[in-house]
Structure formats: structure tokens, C-alpha cells
Amino acid sequence: MSKSALLVLEDGTVFRGVSIGADGISVGEVVFNTSMTGYQEILTDPSYSQQIVTLTYPHIGNTGTTSEDEESSSIHAQGLVIRDLPLIASNFRSEQSLSDYLKSQNIVGIADIDTRKLTRILREKGAQNGCIVAGNNLDEALALAKAKEFPGLKGMDLAKEVTTKEAYQWKQGSWTLEGGLPEAKDDSELPYHVVAYDFGAKRNILRMLVDRGCRLTVVPAETSAEDVLALNPDGVFLSNGPGDPAPCTYAIEATKVFLENGLPVFGICLGHQILALASGAKTVKMKFGHHGANHPVKDLDRNVVMITSQNHGFAADEATLPDNLRATHVSLFDGSLQGIHRTDKPAFSFQGHPEASPGPHDAAPLFDHFIELIKQHSA
């Protein structure tokens, strides 16, 4: 017999549905994601730390879950909100149903609610704090109180919470349909040594760097610039991650040192915002952010439109860009800044996710540009 669940927003709106995950209470910022596929990649993306994810596509769970599709070692989203959970997961790769997957990691989830209504509320009022309660004791008053108590993501440094505790090497390339996940590559196949800061890095980013010949040393978020320079890298990568970039002063200061030393730097998502802050720009909290795999972005240099994967609630403010930063990409949804490039240093960044997972690969050539900068710097 299905257990009940409820979602309460901080404005007092209540949604009643059925539990599809673990029993318990979960609090976070409620956001909506418009991706039709890739729910497992979304749930395991560390960028969703302290967020409750609403998926707007009505049927979620059709393909079950598989360990090969995880973007990190565990689910980082605080909870999941969907319209309908299919009774059958049809996929030859599936290892576990979505419901069992949520329960195995003690994640709450709610289904059978009007996700279109919820999305309209978030779109019109902005991202709200919320609380999911699942199980036998559904206390609306308690849920509302907990939603109102949640401090919100502005000013919250989450990168140091989700980062790796110790540095490690990564040499595994991308998954293929024919071979699955490959064995680690030999150093002879990886001519470029790149230090990757883990602010909440997705595995597919690391794999796409390896595909292009990068031998990765992945380091904790608070690793000093001096420790990184001692590794003698050919380039530095700044990963995606959750929370507000402004409190990440350790990363901002380290990035300033890399820029002063002329090292090639490539940032994605939070890493993009870190590069902007290190270069003198400012960041802002967005009304409801960008979350989905169908976002059109204009490449200003090539005058073409890309369809991209997005997941961010903060953005670099184009109005604050200093003279040494030029805009390279803008969102065609709201005109917000999507990409920057230093005019005086081999450093650039992109707000979206060129590694996709899930999503299109239109922006994947950005990885190639990073390799070009490394080659030019090494010449």
C-alpha cells in the first residue's frame, strides 16, 4: 500500500501526493528542471546539494537506474518531486527501480502532484524553500515551519561540503554503448597534466577531459594555489558545484594566482562564476535559475545557437565585467551571461554544462578550446 507524502512551500502552498522514496522529512530550495531524460544524472549531480528537484516531464522512472549513469558516488538532491512514477522500468541496463534507488539512499520523494502548477508558482514567484514529508505522520504545520526556517542558498558555501576529502587521479574516458565504461588509460595516452578543482565535479566532465588527452589530478576545493603549482600542471580546471560562489574566497584567491602565472584555466558552472569573481566581476542570485537540457545559448564569436544543458541558480553579472573580460555566450531565454573569456590571459569559462549528461553536446567543443590553450601555452 502506498504511503502518503506532502510538499509544503514557504508561501504556505501545500501539495499532497504519494511517497516514492524513503520515509522522513527533507528541506531545501525547490527548483524545476525541464529535462525529459537523465533523472539519475540530475539526482547525483553535486550541484543540486540543498535543493529539492521538480522534474516537469510527466513520466519519470521509465528506464530505472544503473550505477554507470551516476555523476557522483551518491544522490545529492535533497528530494525529488514528479508527476507520475511508471510501474515498470524498461531498460536492459537497469539495475534498480527509481523508487528503490531513492529508498536505498534515504532520499524522500513525492509523486502524483500537479507539477505544472508547482512550476508556474516557482516561475512567477521565484525559487522557494520547501519541505517534503513522507510516511505516516504528515504534519503540515511542521513542514511549513521547517520550510520557513531554511536559510536559502544565498551566502551558502556548499563547494567545501561536497568536495573530495583527498586528491586523486582520474584517467577513465567516456562510456560507449558498445563497451560501457572503459578501463583507465595509460599515462602514455594522456600527454596533458590538468589539475581539476572539485567543487562538486560531475564524472562526465572528467571523462571528456580524459578523452582529449588529459591526465587529471582532482583536488579538494580548498587546495591552495601553491600546492597546485607544485604539481606543475599544464592547465587548471574549475568544476561545477552547488551554492553561492561569492563565499568561496579560497577558490577565488587561488584562481587569481593561476591567472597571474598565465596558466590556462577553464571553468564550468560554479567554476565559471569563480573565474568571473577572480577577474573582478560580480555574481547575482537568479529568480529561479536555469535547470534543464534544452536551453538555447548564442555563441557570440561564431554567431550560432547551441542547445545546452543548464543547472545554476547564480550568474555572473555582465554589467560588472571589467575590461579584461569579454562576453562570449548569452542565454536566449533571458539574455543572462553564459560565457566569458579573458582578453589578457588564456582563461575562459561557460555557465552551462558542455559535458551534458544529460543533454545535447553542442557545447562540447569548449573542451577542445581548453586543449588548444594548453598547447599554445606549452609551445
Curated annotation (Swiss-Prot):
SUPFAM superfamilies in alphabetical order: Carbamoyl phosphate synthetase, small subunit N-terminal domain, Class I glutamine amidotransferase-like
Record lineage: Bacteria, Pseudomonadati, Pseudomonadota, Gammaproteobacteria, Vibrionales
NCBIfam families: CPSaseIIsmall, PRK12838.1
Encoding gene per record: carA
Binding site for L-glutamine: S47, G241, G243, L270, Q273, N311, G313, F314
Enzyme class: ligase
Name the UniProt record assigns to this protein: Carbamoyl phosphate synthase small chain
One Pfam family in the UniProt entry: CPSase_sm_chain
Nucleotide-binding recorded as keyword: yes
Domain Glutamine amidotransferase type-1, first and last residues per copy: 193-379
Catalysed reaction equations from the record: hydrogencarbonate + L-glutamine + 2 ATP + H2O = carbamoyl phosphate + L-glutamate + 2 ADP + phosphate + 2 H(+)
A Gene Ontology molecular function term of the record: glutaminase activity
Pathway: Amino-acid biosynthesis; L-arginine biosynthesis; carbamoyl phosphate from bicarbonate: step 1/1; Pyrimidine metabolism; UMP biosynthesis via de novo pathway; (S)-dihydroorotate from bicarbonate: step 1/3
Known role: Small subunit of the glutamine-dependent carbamoyl phosphate synthetase (CPSase). CPSase catalyzes the formation of carbamoyl phosphate from the ammonia moiety of glutamine, carbonate, and phosphate donated by ATP, constituting the first step of 2 biosynthetic pathways, one leading to arginine and/or urea and the other to pyrimidine nucleotides. The small subunit (glutamine amidotransferase) binds and cleaves glutamine to supply the large subunit with the substrate ammonia.
Keywords from the UniProt entry: Amino-acid biosynthesis, Arginine biosynthesis, ATP-binding, Glutamine amidotransferase, Ligase, Nucleotide-binding, Pyrimidine biosynthesis
InterPro entries for this protein: Anth_synth/Amidotransfase (IPR050472), CarbamoylP_synth_ssu (IPR006274), CarbamoylP_synth_ssu_N (IPR002474), CarbP_synth_ssu_N_sf (IPR036480), Class_I_gatase-like (IPR029062), CPSase_GATase1 (IPR035686), GATASE (IPR017926)
